[in-house]
């Protein structure tokens, strides 16, 4: 036998059996089925993305054990056929243009180099774009002008109305009522005790008037009793009907007023004193209010200063406490280092103190 014939037969046996190739096309979107069927006993198979290899599916996307799918690379890859009837066609759902390419259906049979291989070429094209013409209907508006002339006749009856003169009498009653009654109710409460914190010195000029009657009669003088400057009520002089009187009055102060009637009766009025007391009370109230306001402001300022001082003390304490802790930690670490150095020095000194004493009486 020729050697060439032997070599060719060996190559055919080593190569897997190829059933053929199929071409499948479709548009992107719908599902596409790649056909694959085999005969004989139910056996395992695989689908490979790419051309069929020599021994196994190197880029397998679906594997079966003959009756069930054991591996699926993507959920879009499905075997919808009856595996027990040897229908192992591959269905790809939601296809895209990127799915185009070569697929290999490999069915494994018993024995060496007996696998069946089917090569499927898939071509997916983009979906066709359908252009729908748009028809626009424009309604036509027709305008019809109609002119209608209607004769208009208007009859207005003329009626003469007699003139009537109506006498008009206008009477305007005038009533003027003037009420000139004025009632003034004045209630004056003079406090019996008045505390005036300030001392006011008022110069007093004393004028002594003496009336000499034409006839010598016994004369009686009523002089006011001297009072202290703190007394709010001045000394009063009772009215006298005597023909001679000596009166001491302050001429520079408007607090006193005197009236004299025809019978030489002297009457003293205390309105000026009451007005002075009211003015002094108002001044005292104003001073008290101002002092209270100043006290409130001073209290608020003092409170703020106290709070700021407390805050500064707390911050200073925290700062010094941290500083002391750091100093203690540094001193503690330095003490440990010194202790270790002392221990090392003692050990070295102890080793230096060891010496060897040779015996003077050495034996042969």
UniProtKB/Swiss-Prot annotation:
* Residue intervals passing through the bilayer: 296-316
Renumbered to this chain, the signal peptide range is 1-20
Compartment list: Cell membrane
Instruction: Name all Ig-like V-type domain ranges.
Output: 21-121
Instruction: Please list where the region (12 X 6 AA approximate tandem repeats of V-P-T-T-T-T]) is annotated.
Output: 138-207
**According to the UniProt topology, which residue ranges lie Cytoplasmic?**
317-364
Q: Which UniProt keywords apply?
A: Cell membrane, Disulfide bond, Glycoprotein, Host cell receptor for virus entry, Host-virus interaction, Immunoglobulin domain, Isopeptide bond, Membrane, Receptor, Repeat, Signal, Transmembrane, Transmembrane helix, Ubl conjugation
The reported effect of residue 114 to A is:
About 60% loss of Chikungunya virus entry
Q: How does it sit in the membrane?
A: Single-pass type I membrane protein
Q: Which cysteines are joined by disulfide bonds?
A: 36-105, 46-57, 52-104
State the superkingdom.
Eukaryota
Q: What more does the record tell us?
A: The extracellular part of the protein can be cleaved and detected in urine and is in correlation with the expression in the kidney.
Q: How does it assemble?
A: Interacts with STAM. Interacts with SELPLG.
In Swiss-Prot or TrEMBL terms, this protein is called Hepatitis A virus cellular receptor 1
């Amino acid at each position: 036998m020729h050697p060439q014939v032997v070599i060719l037969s060996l190559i055919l046996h080593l190569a897997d059996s190829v059933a053929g190739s199929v071409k499948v096309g479709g548009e992107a979107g719908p599902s596409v089925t790649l056909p694959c069927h085999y005969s004989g006993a139910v056996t395992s198979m695989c689908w490979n993305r790419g051309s069929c290899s020599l021994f196994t599916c190197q880029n397998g996307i679906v594997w079966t054990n003959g009756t069930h799918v054991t591996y699926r690379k993507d959920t879009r890859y499905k075997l919808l056929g009856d595996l027990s009837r040897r229908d192992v066609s591959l269905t790809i759902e939601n296809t895209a243009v990127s799915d185009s390419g070569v697929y290999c259906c490999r069915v494994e049979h018993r024995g060496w180099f007996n696998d069946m291989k089917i090569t499927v070429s898939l071509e997916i094209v983009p979906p066709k774009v359908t252009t729908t013409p748009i028809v626009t209907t424009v309604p036509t508006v027709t305008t019809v002008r109609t002119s209608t002339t209607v004769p208009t006749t208007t009859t207005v009856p003329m009626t003469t109305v007699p003139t009537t003169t109506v006498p008009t009498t206008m009477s305007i009653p005038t009533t003027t009522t003037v009420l000139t009654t004025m009632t003034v109710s004045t209630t004056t409460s003079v406090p019996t005790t008045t505390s005036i914190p300030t001392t006011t010195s008022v110069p007093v000029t004393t004028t002594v008037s003496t009336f000499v009657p034409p006839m010598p009669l016994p004369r009686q003088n009523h002089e006011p009793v001297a009072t202290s400057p703190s007394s709010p009520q001045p000394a009063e002089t009772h009215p006298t009907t005597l023909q001679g009187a000596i009166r001491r009055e302050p001429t520079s102060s408007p607090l006193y007023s005197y009236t004299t009637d025809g019978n030489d009766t002297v009457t003293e009025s205390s309105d000026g004193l009451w007005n002075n007391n009211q003015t002094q009370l108002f001044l005292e109230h104003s001073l008290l209010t101002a002092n209270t306001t100043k006290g409130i402001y001073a209290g608020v300022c003092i409170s703020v200063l106290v709070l700021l001082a407390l805050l500064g003390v707390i911050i200073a304490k925290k700062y010094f406490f941290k500083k002391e802790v750091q100093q203690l930690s540094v001193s503690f670490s330095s003490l440990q280092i010194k202790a270790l150095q002392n221990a090392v020095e003692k050990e070295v000194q102890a080793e230096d103190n060891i010496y060897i004493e040779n015996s003077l009486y050495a034996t042969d």
